[in-house]
């Protein structure tokens, strides 16, 4: 095994992304999930900016401040830093994340993540979104490896299925407490133990 490829939401950070709708509905309780999701998904695929999301939803005033107040509610997953420090000098590391360009940049700078990763594939930058297999294949190509050399960690079964389809070794980080028939862990301590036991990472 030569590389570890990680999802962002629900893996590197605690929040799975499912908190955005209720966060918005605190201010706009009458907005439907669909009305919130439509601009959000457009930003994730790079069709609009993240600031356009807040404006479309109905927020007014200093949109950058409003956005940063939301992003500052997001926290790193427990044990992530310890995990990444253990593997950073032994294996290539990559992120594949469905996110707007601005949100991803803000969070990566906030948590000083860029220094850890050889490849960072963000849907808003690439205009490719999981579960489109092209974002996986592009990441593998940028790593300069074969798919079978890569472990992929995500909290969503659909993304893991695509990773497996292209030849990566999928692992569920079960931050959302879902049922999954494949290889799964509950935290980064378990992930370290699993990759050592099953994939030979030491």
Residue ranges and their predicted role:
Residues 19, 75, 102, 157-158:
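Short alpha-helical
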Residues 51, 65-94, 105, 133:
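Short, acidic loop-to-helix structural element flanking the phosphoryl-transfer center
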Residues 1-38, 56-61, 165-166, 180:
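Active-site neighborhood of HAD-like aspartate-dependent phosphohydrolases
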């Amino acid at each position: 095994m030569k590389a570890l490829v990680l999802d962002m939401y629900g893996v590197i950070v605690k929040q799975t992304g499912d908190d955005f709708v209720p966060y918005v509905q605190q201010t706009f309780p009458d907005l439907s999930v669909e009305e919130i999701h439509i601009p959000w998904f457009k930003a994730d695929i790079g069709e609009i900016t993240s600031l356009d999301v807040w404006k479309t939803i109905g927020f007014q005033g200093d949109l950058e401040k409003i956005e940063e107040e939301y992003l500052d509610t997001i926290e790193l997953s427990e044990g992530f830093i310890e995990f990444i420090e253990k593997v950073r000098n032994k294996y290539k590391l990559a992120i594949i994340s469905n996110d707007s360009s601005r949100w991803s940049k803000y969070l990566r700078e906030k948590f000083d993540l860029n220094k850890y990763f050889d490849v960072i594939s963000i849907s808003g930058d690439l205009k490719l979104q999981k579960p489109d297999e092209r974002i996986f294949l592009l990441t593998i190509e940028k790593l300069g490896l074969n798919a079978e050399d890569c472990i992929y960690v995500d909290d969503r079964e659909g993304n893991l299925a695509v990773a497996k389809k292209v030849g990566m070794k999928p692992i569920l980080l079960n931050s959302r407490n879902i049922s999954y028939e494949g290889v799964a862990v509950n935290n980064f301590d378990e992930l370290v133990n699993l990759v050592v036991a099953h994939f030979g990472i030491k």
